Amino acid sequence: MTYDFDIPVDRRGTWSVQWDGVDRRFGAAGLLPFTISDMDFACPPPVLVALQERVAHGVFGYTDWQNEEFRSAVRDWYRVRHATEIDTGRLVYAPSVLNQLSQLLRMWTEPGDAVVVHTPVYDGFRKAVGGLGRELRGVPLDDPAALEAALARDDSRVLLLCSPHNPTGRVWTEAELAGFAALAERCGVAVISDEIHADFVHDGHRHLPWTRFGRGRWALITSGTKSFNFPALTGSYGVVGEAADHAEFVRRMETGEGLGSPAVLSLVAHIAAYREGGEWLDEVRAYVAGNLSLVADRLNSAFLALSWEPPQAGYLAWIDLRPLGVDDAALQRELVEGERVAIMPGSVYGAPGFVRLNVGCARSKAEAGVGALTRALGRLT
């Protein structure tokens, strides 16, 4: 490999939510964290070089995101990585994917309307939807009948997809996505597809952008910040299907939100990542796949009842512990007090009996995490 991901980067004292903010969520300081979904790896070298060059310029005035360098970087990335043509005339820009989601929900729903999601559900969705006074209507991941029934209800206005799915790492098939599109059209429901994990799909699986399936009212919302690990720079972009909705989104961002000018370093990072970061992304994805295989080997060797398989996308190990019959609260006490690690409980995503272990990190840390989880489970079974 060209890049060495085995060397840990010390993130303590950098205002990191994962490392320095762990005590606020888990009630104890100094824990080894496997929590919020960012990685411990430094950004791709081409991104760092581009940022350094832009900082050296020294002027950070108001910036236009609707420039050809950014548009063409997005267009070419989708063309090469996803064999998909993007209409850059339908691009929008916002500080974050959740910011885009909130804006679209204000456009397409009213307080009290329902937004349908697959469960377990990313907790950011719950906060965004509930915070706007809309109802989050969950349906199980593998229950098409429940999805159809939920979308057919009179107050359902939006199908909110997570593609690939967080927290499970599920990659939707072409048949599934086409089915969602047909069902949404039949029920008169808009579709918002959050595809921030799209570029971290593992071998043997393929992500298909919603632009291939969208009918009527729809939007794809995404960002390079997740796969290339620069979320603190902010910045996201999307594709809005209908011309009138696209114009309305841009108008709202530039007027009501006052967000016409993006963070220039985010634009620089996106362009550099999409133009020169592909090799780094391929290597970090392969490295993380090794971490996930390590987790599977350790867990399944210790607990034959689990038969855990790595996710199809991402660096978050979503682990079903229900076969072991372990109490969630007892497990968290063992992890925090006994092992001094922070691992997200499944209850955060509406799924008691699961945990979500972030292994976007050096192998030594991944080994420490799965080792701690295995020991804690061993004491409780």
Where are these regions (language model features)?
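Conserved core segment of the aminotransferase class I/II
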Residues: 216-289
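PLP-dependent enzyme catalytic core of the Aspartate aminotransferase-like
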Residues: 325, 334-343, 348-381
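Helix C-cap/helix->beta junction micro-motif
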Residues: 132, 186-187, 339
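Hydrophobic residues in well-ordered beta-strands that form the structural core
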Residues: 117, 138, 191-193, 343-345
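N-terminal small-domain helix-loop-helix segment of the aminotransferase-like
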Residues: 2-96, 103, 273-274, 380-381
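Conserved glycine-rich beta-strand-loop-beta hairpin in the small C-terminal domain of fold type I
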Residues: 267, 271, 288-296, 308-321
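Conserved core of the PLP fold type I
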Residues: 60-183, 199-214, 219, 371
